[in-house]
Design a protein with these regions (language model features):
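Alpha-helix-centered segments that form part of catalytic cores
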Residues: 85-121
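Charged catalytic cores and adjacent phosphate/nucleic-acid-binding surfaces used
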Residues: 1-10, 21-64, 102-103, 116, ...
Length: 215
């Protein structure tokens, strides 16, 4: 995945597996090899079946948050024959174990609790693919809640999104890549050579503006 990101001309990417950050260490190591900055993160499923992205400044915070999220998953084991293997990778493409719980399940945390958990580890919560029918905030809840505020949201490419949901918000454009061929080419360009810290600072600053930035 990281190598393909380099081929696509991407300088900074986020790795956000479902309900775990356990593969972030290997992704960051691969990023050093390929010259790609990797932001450690997760895509957490709330009990309402809403996907919330969590971006973290450091690997340790992401891993600790990931352990707490994993504890909130139901004790339902993955069935590889049905859902595929949930591999932990090390040293490139070398499998180093598996995770037992089925990661695509919802946690027992509400949307608000997921956001609070991410923030408690210094992370940035961002609603994922809000305009996608499944697991997007609009499709799952029927609306974009007024509170907590979501100044930054992610939208899914090629799917219409209501204007009220995006007005005044900073939009991240998602490839939501689960396969190599899904990885998009760059959407945003920063004036200076970007780093992961630059991207996180931009998102955090936009989040801090809150409702002041909205019409």
């Amino acid at each position: 995945m990281v190598g393909m990101a380099r081929v696509k001309g991407l300088d900074v990417i986020a790795i956000t597996d479902h309900n775990t950050a356990r593969n972030a260490p290997d992704a960051i190591a691969a990023g050093r090899e390929y010259g790609v900055q990797v932001i450690p993160g997760m895509e957490i499923t709330s009990r309402e079946e809403v996907h919330i992205l969590g971006y973290f400044d450091g690997l340790d915070a992401a891993l600790r948050a990931g352990e707490e999220v994993y504890a909130h998953l139901p004790d339902i084991r993955n069935e590889p024959a049905l859902f595929g293997n949930q591999l932990l990778m090390r040293d490139g493409d070398t499998p180093a174990g598996t995770l037992e719980k089925l990661l695509i399940n919802a946690t027992d945390l509400s949307v608000e609790e997921v956001c609070a958990l991410i923030k408690s580890y210094g992370g940035i919560p961002v609603p994922a693919h809000i305009n996608r029918g499944s697991n997007g905030m609009i499709g799952a809840l029927g609306l974009m809640p007024m509170l907590p505020e979501y100044p930054v949201v992610e939208v899914y490419k090629g799917v219409p999104c209501p204007k009220y949901a995006t007005a005044g918000r900073f939009l991240l454009h998602s490839s939501d890549a689960h396969r190599l061929e899904d990885i998009q080419e760059r959407v945003f360009e920063l004036d200076a050579l970007p780093t992961a810290a630059d991207v996180l600072r931009l998102i955090r600053e936009r989040n801090a503006l809150g409702s002041e930035a909205r019409p």
